[in-house]
Amino acid sequence: GPTGIGVLFGKKEWLDKLPPYQGGGEMINHVRWSGTTYNELPYKFEAGTPNYVGSYALSKAIDYIQSIDISSIAAHETQLTAYCEAQLAAIEGVHIYAADQPKAGAVSFNVYINGKLIHPFDIGTLLDQQGVTIRTGHHCAQPLIEELGVPGTARVSFGLYNEKEDIDIFIAALKKAIIMLS
């Protein structure tokens, strides 16, 4: 759907105390030399013209997810994650982080050839050239990556629209990338 939509969810007592991060539109009651008085919730955090298209799209996305049932989606992602881990574990030189631990639809890994770490960016680039998109880098968790002692990881993620065949395509592309780097 359209970009630029979000939801701020919190306790009223905290939201009342929280200042808005930007100003404009109906969020302000009064502006004076002595200070600004903000509108009541939720308007206090709605600067500028509301994103009507984004809010409609978000509403429809929520309806869609509710019609499927979030637990069914979670079960599907869990099955895909387990399948992917099994496929990755069968490839020599692939190190899976938190192998056999519960995960939420994503597997982080690195590739070693002859004991030498292949930079995850190189893996991501070669997969991209084959039409497979993964995420590489710190994943907004740089302290963890530093603790692991690696420059980053490769991460493959799954969602509602993925199937086992997508993982098979990813695994075939990864094997080809490893051969190219060997």
Language-model segments: what does each one mean?
Residues 1-182:
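Pyridoxal 5′-phosphate
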